[in-house]
A protein has these predicted regions:
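Glycine-rich beta-strand-centered segment in the early N-terminal region that forms part
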Residues: 22-41, 52-93, 133-135
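N-terminal Rossmann-like NAD(P) cofactor-binding module of classical short-chain dehydrogenase/reductase
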Residues: 82, 223, 246
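NAD(P)H dinucleotide-binding glycine-rich loop of Rossmann-like/cofactor-binding domains
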Residues: 89-168
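Mid-domain Rossmann-like dinucleotide-binding core that forms the NAD(H)/NADP(H) cofactor-binding site
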Residues: 136-212
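A generic alpha-to-beta junction signature in SAM-dependent methyltransferases
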Residues: 158-159, 226, 239-240
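A short acidic, Gly/Pro-enriched loop at the edge of an enzyme's catalytic core
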Residues: 214-222
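Glycine-rich phosphate-binding loop and adjacent beta-alpha segment
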Residues: 230-288, 323
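C-terminal hydrophobic helical "lid"/dimerization subdomain
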Residues: 278-323
Length: 323
């Protein structure tokens, strides 16, 4: 099959990559696998970090996808699906506690010891599949994974109408977080560097502020979605005493930061990663969030190298691949 392959040094299109069917056939019966024909896959910031050496991954990247089941349990054949990206072992303490996302032996689609969705087919545990409602287009469904990550915040903290929330970052993740948190009734402000991206967020009814116009003030909750050390420092300066700081993005670069404000101001710091796919699909089906305005361009998989270069440009929105 055709796939976009990362060998640790170079990204290339491989027209004869070993099919994901071999993965389905080779898995133990404990983890029943489905072979999914990929309709669309999204390039995200994590993929771009992988191309810089993050996680030491080699193989087929990609973890945001929508497709249809071509092989697997009969009841799933032909169904349009998305899939949770963490493949737990099913036997450890975390898996037994329904925390497979934190399984120490987990594989992660396109990130850790498992080929991903930048290919014609991807192999996914049946237990990880979610059926896509007919009311949700492929172009919407491909956002399920990052949208679920935004919904994870609402499972971790209690937001009430009138709470003041600041979302730092106007990129794709910041946009989705702002839209989702607005559903809580809290008062959301999005802060970013790009007027055009903030304009997209503003259309959802969220107050926006350009960084150049920022006048420091305090918020009950800060969601850090910039992935930058500067964003983290700003977040620590803007959260009220006994407020909450949600770290939604990974800051890969080494950076010295004083944690004294966390102790002095008794700040609650919460790490936040993957989230509930069912909530994301429900929101997409009910049209409570708008994701298609975030799409910049759709590339053919054969042009995947150019697509990844486009995704890495400053100001780029969501780049999709179509096998």
């Amino acid at each position: 099959m055709r796939a976009l392959y990362w060998d640790g040094h170079e990204l290339r299109v491989d027209s004869h990559y070993a099919t994901a069917k071999s993965t389905v056939a080779g898995e133990s019966s404990e983890a029943q696998m489905a072979l999914v024909k990929v309709h669309l896959a999204g390039i995200c910031a994590t993929d771009l970090q992988i191309f810089k050496g993050y996680m030491g991954f080699t193989g087929v990247p990609g973890h945001e996808f929508v497709g249809s089941v071509s092989e697997g349990l009969g009841e799933w054949i032909g169904k349009r699906v998305v899939g949770e990206i963490n493949f737990g072992c099913g036997r450890c303490e975390n898996c037994r506690r329904d925390l497979s996302r934190h399984c120490p032996n987990r594989r992660v689609m396109g990130i850790l010891n498992a080929d991903g969705a930048f290919a014609e087919y991807v192999s996914v545990p049946v237990a990880n599949l979610y059926a896509v409602p007919d009311s949700v287009s492929d172009e919407e469904a491909v956002f399920t994974e990052p949208l679920a990550a935004a919904f994870e915040i609402l499972t971790q903290i209690q937001l009430n109408p009138g709470d003041e929330v600041l979302v730092l970052g106007d990129g794709k993740l910041g946009n989705l977080c702002a839209q989702v948190l607005r559903l809580s009734g809290a008062r959301i402000t999005a802060l970013g560097k790009h007027a055009d991206k903030l304009a997209l967020i503003k259309k959802s009814g969220v107050r926006t502020v350009l960084l150049n116009d920022w006048q420091p003030r305090l918020f009950d909750v800060i969601v850090e979605a910039t992935g930058s050390a500067a964003g983290l420092e700003l977040a620590l300066s803007a959260v009220r005493p006994r407020g909450t700081l949600v770290l939604k993005s990974t800051i890969a670069a080494a950076h010295q930061v004083s944690l004294a404000p966390v102790v002095i101001n008794e700040i609650n710091v919460i790490g936040s990663r993957c989230g509930p796919f069912a909530d994301a699909l429900d929101a997409l089906s009910a049209k409570r969030v708008a994701v298609t305005p975030l799409i910049d361009r759709v590339y053919a998989l054969a042009d995947g190298v150019s697509a990844s270069q486009h995704a890495g440009r400053a100001g780029a929105k969501k780049i999709l691949l179509r096998p």
